[in-house]
Swiss-Prot record:
Gene3D superfamilies: 3.30.230.10. Keywords: Ribonucleoprotein, Ribosomal protein. This is Small ribosomal subunit protein uS9. Belongs to the universal ribosomal protein uS9 family. HAMAP family: Ribosomal_uS9_B (MF_00532_B). One of its GO terms (cellular component) is cytosolic small ribosomal subunit. The lineage of its organism: Bacteria, Pseudomonadati, Pseudomonadota, Gammaproteobacteria, Enterobacterales. GO terms for molecular function: RNA binding; structural constituent of ribosome. GO terms for biological process: translation. The gene is rpsI. It comes from Wigglesworthia glossinidia brevipalpis. Pfam families: Ribosomal_S9 (PF00380). SUPFAM superfamilies: Ribosomal protein S5 domain 2-like.
Length: 129
C-alpha cells in the first residue's frame, strides 16, 4: 500500500505540485526541509493548518515542488495543494476542508498598472495653476 496522491495548488503567481503518501510526517519543499525553506514560523503554521485540522500531521509524508512568486504566494500555493491532495487521499475530508476555506483558490493578485497613472491607482499629482 505505497500509494501516492498528487495535486496542484496556486496562489498569486506561485504554483505548487504536492505529492502525499503515508509516512512519518516529513515535509520537503524542492528537496529542502520545510524549516530550512521557510525560516519564518508563520509560513510553516500556514502550510500545516490543513493537516492539523484533520489530525494527520505525523501520518503523511509530503513532497512539494514549488515555482514562481514570492514566499507568501508559495506558502499559500502549498497549502492549497495539500488541501486538494488530501481530498484525493480521502474524499470524506472535503466538507471539513471546505468549511475551513482551504479548497477555495484565493484569486487575489496584483492589480495591473494603468496608462497615465504612476501605479495601479496612484494618479499623478494634480496642479491647480
Amino acid at each position: 500500500m505505497n500509494e501516492q496522491y498528487y495535486s496542484t495548488g496556486r496562489r498569486k503567481t506561485a504554483s505548487a505540485r504536492v505529492f502525499i503518501k503515508i509516512g512519518k510526517g516529513k515535509i520537503k519543499i524542492n528537496y529542502i526541509d520545510i524549516k530550512k525553506y521557510f525560516n519564518q514560523k508563520t509560513y510553516i503554521t500556514l502550510i500545516k493548518k490543513p493537516l492539523e485540522i484533520i489530525n494527520m500531521t505525523d501520518k503523511l509524508d509530503i513532497f512539494i515542488t514549488v515555482k514562481g512568486g514570492g514566499i507568501s504566494g508559495q506558502a499559500g500555493a502549498i497549502r492549497h495543494g495539500i488541501a486538494r491532495a488530501l481530498i484525493k487521499y480521502d474524499s470524506s475530508l472535503k466538507t471539513t476542508l471546505r468549511d475551513s476555506g482551504f479548497i477555495t483558490r484565493d484569486s487575489r493578485c496584483v492589480e495591473r498598472k494603468k496608462v497615465g497613472f504612476k501605479k495601479a491607482r496612484r494618479r499623478p499629482q494634480f496642479s491647480k495653476r
